[in-house]
Amino acid sequence: MIQKNWQELIKPNKVDFITHGSRTHATVVAEPLERGFGLTLGNALRRVLLSSLRGAAVTAVQIDGVLHEFSSIPGVREDVTDIVLNIKEIAIRMEGEGPKRMVVRKEGPGVVTAGDIQTVGDVEILNPEHVICTLDEGAEIRMEFTVNTGKGYVPADRNRAEDAPIGLIPVDSLYSPVRKVSYKIENTREGQVLDYDKLTLNIETNGSVTGEDAVAYAARILQDQLSIFVNFEEPQKEAPQEQVAELAFNPVLLKKVDELELSVRSANCLKTDNIVYIGDLIQKTEAEMLRTPNFGRKSLNEIKEVLASMGLHLGMEIPAWPPENIEDLAKRYEDQY
């Protein structure tokens, strides 16, 4: 009885990840969801994506000949304040733990970019074309960066160590690999029910993590945080040994096709063709299904999609099907699918 609180809620039968051919942009679509769960999950995932994923960022910079951030450097067009702002935008991926050191040294004339930075083995610059400063003829600059890992946003004053040497300028650190997240809730249908939710998440990252992985990490964080509120153990229901021995196939094949919440046309076509159980259905080939009266390509695609969500497909061979006592077996294994 207790388990029905969560077991009978509808869950998405598919989650689509669309990358748009880019590592930094992704769209995630999940449907169907119970009414209201699109907003609940979308808002929770968005907040965790923006605040709680770990990443790497510059925490401090030391520039030769510069004592503080309100200085200017001869032959450098930008003042130090602008240089620090540009440094904050460097996107970094770091596999290990910090802090690590990076150095850039360049002579003018020319532009100093993130790609000019000399990195250590497990540190990668993800936006090498990003401009840090511009040098005039005869100008020279050397900068040493401190890189660390963390989460969220850390202001510069918290990156200032008490024993920091003179000239070490702390930098605001945006550790989060996720830059933007938006979500949209739309109505969708499942079978004959029209008021389920469809959740669409649009994610932009700095490239250190893909949108698909970012959503997975955020969901895992939520799962871990919510588990503390579960104050009971779920009873484990084991099938008797003699029942297990009777079956040479997945018990889900004993489920009746009229429980699949198919469209009326698809359900009627299956009934016309005397297809009662999923086990009957999956042994049919696509060609056989299309020969069924009033059964078209749209119905075929609908059935293929439902079967795929269960790990099944048309044209499967099932040994020992149908079993002689199929109705009794269907009742006995009803709780297992």
From Swiss-Prot:
Keywords: DNA-directed RNA polymerase, Nucleotidyltransferase, Transcription, Transferase. CDD domains: RNAP_alpha_NTD. Residues 249-337 are annotated as: Alpha C-terminal domain (alpha-CTD). It catalyses: RNA(n) + a ribonucleoside 5'-triphosphate = RNA(n+1) + diphosphate. SUPFAM superfamilies: C-terminal domain of RNA polymerase alpha subunit (SSF47789), Insert subdomain of RNA polymerase alpha subunit (SSF56553), RBP11-like subunits of RNA polymerase (SSF55257). The keyword Transcription applies. DNA-dependent RNA polymerase catalyzes the transcription of DNA into RNA using the four ribonucleoside triphosphates as substrates. Belongs to the RNA polymerase alpha chain family. This is DNA-directed RNA polymerase subunit alpha.
